[in-house]
Amino acid sequence: MIIDADYITEDGKPIIRIFKKEKGEFKVEYDRTFRPYIYALLKDDSAIDEVKKITAERHGKIVRITEVEKVQKKFLGRPIEVWKLYLEHPQDVPAIREKIREHPAVVDIFEYDIPFAKRYLIDKGLTPMEGNEELTFLAVDIETLYHEGEEFGKGPIIMISYADEEGAKVITWKSIDLPYVEVVSSEREMIKRLVKVIREKDPDVIITYNGDNFDFPYLLKRAEKLGIKLPLGRDNSEPKMQRMGDSLAVEIKGRIHFDLFPVIRRTINLPTYTLEAVYEAIFGKSKEKVYAHEIAEAWETGKGLERVAKYSMEDAKVTFELGKEFFPMEAQLARLVGQPVWDVSRSSTGNLVEWFLLRKAYERNELAPNKPDEREYERRLRESYEGGYVKEPEKGLWEGIVSLDFRSLYPSIIITHNVSPDTLNRENCKEYDVAPQVGHRFCKDFPGFIPSLLGNLLEERQKIKKRMKESKDPVEKKLLDYRQRAIKILANSYYGYYGYAKARWYCKECAESVTAWGRQYIDLVRRELESRGFKVLYIDTDGLYATIPGAKHEEIKEKALKFVEYINSKLPGLLELEYEGFYARGFFVTKKKYALIDEEGKIVTRGLEIVRRDWSEIAKETQAKVLEAILKHGNVDEAVKIVKEVTEKLSKYEIPPEKLVIYEQITRPLSEYKAIGPHVAVAKRLAAKGVKVKPGMVIGYIVLRGDGPISKRAIAIEEFDPKKHKYDAEYYIENQVLPAVERILRAFGYRKEDLKYQKTKQVGLGAWLKF
């Protein structure tokens, strides 16, 4: 099983290294024969002798083309003859490529920006993570001492925790009497002990949570200050930091550094990404949070160190559990796109699609288009096109709602209509599909590059799902599930990739044709439904909600199922409408904002944001009760009464302060904030009192009654004293409770002023409801 690949230089020549796990043993394979190359398209082949003479300089050494070879390729499906230009060293490519491109005889150069080791994996058909080797995992986490204003890495590391299948341990340099704590003499010895642990346990995968931007950069900084090395790589090298967009990325040679943070950010949508919040979201278990100022206080006073050690140990344990949960999926994505987990776990879906396409292009002898230069990128960003069809929702409370949607609408359109850059407006074509409204023509004489790949992916996914149903082995079932989910992620990213401004196979005409066909098919479904007595309540891109006013639930379900069967007989190719589900009651506020309740009493919401972290508990609770009154009891007047009661209790200071706390996360160093919001103001006041405030910390505050801006009246929850302080009732009514429910109740004709507690009685609008 290939874990990773890179190259080293020996006597000026590159040597590919393949890091592998074979029969339980780690090994490195070397290849000294692979050479870097690029392709050049010439105006006239006779100019090749001139091109061969082009030289450049790198670190005082002359860079030259060592060999040339004329090759037959395809470019967007059309035959093309190009020259393959070999160079001595991968770093020669960036040194000489512009000189080659600028030569008068050169039309353009291609595939000059594919990293050497990745190029090797593609050309040799090697796939990381293929095989049944059992990898070993170790999670690592650090705790540091930090005071506001200090530069990164100034304060010592006070604890290092690690966890694997055998359990979790903590290394520290202050005396703590706990069975899982190992005490050493100094920070220096603690870091050296970590190195020893990693070398002894020799894990294939090191799991961290934000290790790219915190744990490893901090460890490297402290090791440097203490004059010690951090040889964590299997080749005894230190972790290597590199820039990746706005972030850092840390590589450990011979091991996979699996940082959960970018993976979880890409995979799940949460209001906050603290380790505690993620653990609760994934496993439904809570984990105690010990705040930075508490850690600092415990370390400096010696009181409460056991609690900090337990917290540190749990950090490593939780990171290990999360790592084991998320790693298999990333391993399957790595297998699918043919690049190492280290890269895949830090990639956007657009980049995953691109690596997959680069590999398949090589297999099919296709020359990959170039990435856009700055000017072309800016031009693409300015381009726009019409998206999916969204129908404004029908207002009111509705009963007996069916949900129908297309299965993989955009991938199905791409395959059915052969939507691809190489089939677009193709000359000498016998059969075309013409996109509605936009008029782009796609040749049907041959399968397009991307539609054929997408078709293979969807076919493979169906086979895997069939095997899952047949399999009785739970382990095999789980692995197959990871595989089919990885395919789904990739398949669903192709439409977005066509419109991704940095894409090699960018195709605005393809993207707008896909959405045009999407609008046509969903509108066809709408018209056919309405002709059969259904009322369509809401449409969004690939799905819709409908009912038959006055009909019984069973009749609506039966007619919907028959309709799905009928419409699928009319739809072309892979297009298929599915009966998604049935809801007893529901309402639609605006586009992408609705709430429904199924027949089991489960409430489903979209876009109503009852989990945002900067909403207080009272706002979330009120919204939940309002939804329950409307959906479970079908009573909007009851919902209005709930809101009035809450606003009355707030006005009379009858709501407990713990329900008023607003949480917001510090996302960067305090000195970098230009706009001072309430959470930043509170954080700055805490820092002035010696509390360690760092990016990622969540600040909880309550807004007090008084004059002046909110930022001056916000107080940390720890400092709130109900005997001394009064919360700002008007602020919580106007900025928390009413915004949480107003958009819901506006859909039933209520205005903001109708929802507040008033001494005079309001007339209800319940008669306005539709049943």
Swiss-Prot record:
Molecular-function annotations in GO: DNA binding; DNA-directed DNA polymerase activity; nucleotide binding
Gene3D superfamilies: DNA polymerase family B, C-terminal domain (1.10.132.60), DNA Polymerase, chain B, domain 1 (3.30.342.10), Helix hairpin bin (1.10.287.690), Palm domain of DNA polymerase (3.90.1600.10), Ribonuclease H-like superfamily/Ribonuclease H (3.30.420.10)
CDD domains attached to this UniProt entry: DNA_polB_Kod1_like_exo, POLBc_B3
Catalytic activity of the protein: DNA(n) + a 2'-deoxyribonucleoside 5'-triphosphate = DNA(n+1) + diphosphate
Enzyme type, top EC level: transferase
PROSITE patterns for this protein: DNA_POLYMERASE_B
Name of a matching Pfam family: DNA_pol_B_exo1
GO-annotated biological processes: DNA-templated DNA replication
Coiled-coil features, chain-numbered ranges: none
Keyword terms, alphabetized: DNA replication, DNA-binding, DNA-directed DNA polymerase, Nucleotidyltransferase, Transferase
Listed EC numbers: 2.7.7.7
InterPro entries the record matches: DNA-dir_DNA_pol_B, DNA-dir_DNA_pol_B_CS, DNA-dir_DNA_pol_B_exonuc, DNA-dir_DNA_pol_B_multi_dom, DNA/RNA_pol_sf, DNA_pol_B_thumb, DNA_pol_palm_dom_sf, DNA_pol_type-B
Similarity field: Belongs to the DNA polymerase type-B family.
NCBIfam families for the chain: pol2
Protein name as it appears in the record: DNA polymerase 1
Gene giving rise to this polypeptide: polI
